[in-house]
């Protein structure tokens, strides 16, 4: 249980789960603790994410602190171009350099982090706690058994329109063309956002095979997005929501293996 001097820090990722987790943290601790809600601006998210953030500020009754990277212009493509890779076994550099680095500079010792893990993600929380017994985290959605669909419904019941990406059928409000997506997801991005899809193709042309995200299931060879064949289009493909904290949790898990 956090002491009264502890800061409770919620990371708002412009997704429904982090919105509800933040609202619940305010309900649980807003009267007794310093609850901070932070967001990392990313230029590659849909512009409607900013509308959603403003609506949630009204719902929360307080402003959200927006952190913004300046080294890469908060742009994932700039990260990939300058770091010369798109993803490796430790994850994607965009989330590390555009989100985690900002949080590292902002956080204070003793902060308690609010994880937006949903009830479907109990195993991720268990793994994190097992491997980080000295790190204080709160998971209000799991504590209340709330799943992803519950969170969306709660946001709508609060009179807030879900982010445009959800309304198109996507599973989250990550960047348009999130590099954690699979083939079906990228077929959907190719249809809905051809310009952003072409930007990633162009990057892969520049960086070469090391930047390719997908493998041929038969030959096991990597192939570029430009060579993505026809097949199922999956807007609702499950992709982890991109947040500072989930990324920290996953990175810590990989580092300890
Ligand atoms: S949403 Fe995807 S592409 Fe955007 S920063 Fe996170 S991991 Fe990178």
Predicted regions and their residues:
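Nucleotide-activated chemistry modules centered on ATP-dependent adenylation/adenylyltransferase
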Residues: 1-257
